[in-house]
Amino acid sequence: DSITKEQKEWVIAYFKHHVIKHINPVIIDTDTDLVSFLKDEFTYLLVNMTDGEEVHHALIEIPTDKLPRFIRMPSEDNTVTFMFLDDVIRVGMNKIFYGLFNYTKIEAYSIKMNRDAEYDLLGNIDRSVLENMSEALKQRLNAMPVRFSYDAQMPEHMVNFMARELKMSSIDSMMAGNRYHHFKDLLSFPSLG
């Protein structure tokens, strides 16, 4: 939030030249099956666009498989400044949705969903443990969500919207968390040397 005008211009240019080609927003409507769409352990931005009573939602997968999670920004002094890829996308959101929807307010919050990871590695005694593990991993791709993590700053109406869309029950875990998810990406933090 505290970047200079020059840095913001650089971020918008970076977004246009490097990021937007990897963004495939999913517009959420009554036909969207988020349970099937969301990938286990991936971080997304849930976008909320409002214009008076009219509300639209979309999901953006953070493309960390194509781009670094941490973007080094130029600075005029000797300081080193990084920005999360999530925030680069937030800065460029109008470039994605302008013209698709009329909105006076646009906001985005991080979310992550985990699927049921219960494995029965010895379930079929006619198969090896490796074959059973392979089958269990395939089942996990289609398993129901059991945990939904979201930015604690996300408005309650958006949390409730996602709980409905993901068909979360009272026994499933919904956890308010930090603005950023998937901290294993810190392992790929660029060297400062």
Language model features: what each stretch is:
Residues 1-193:
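N-terminal non-catalytic structural scaffold regions of very large proteins
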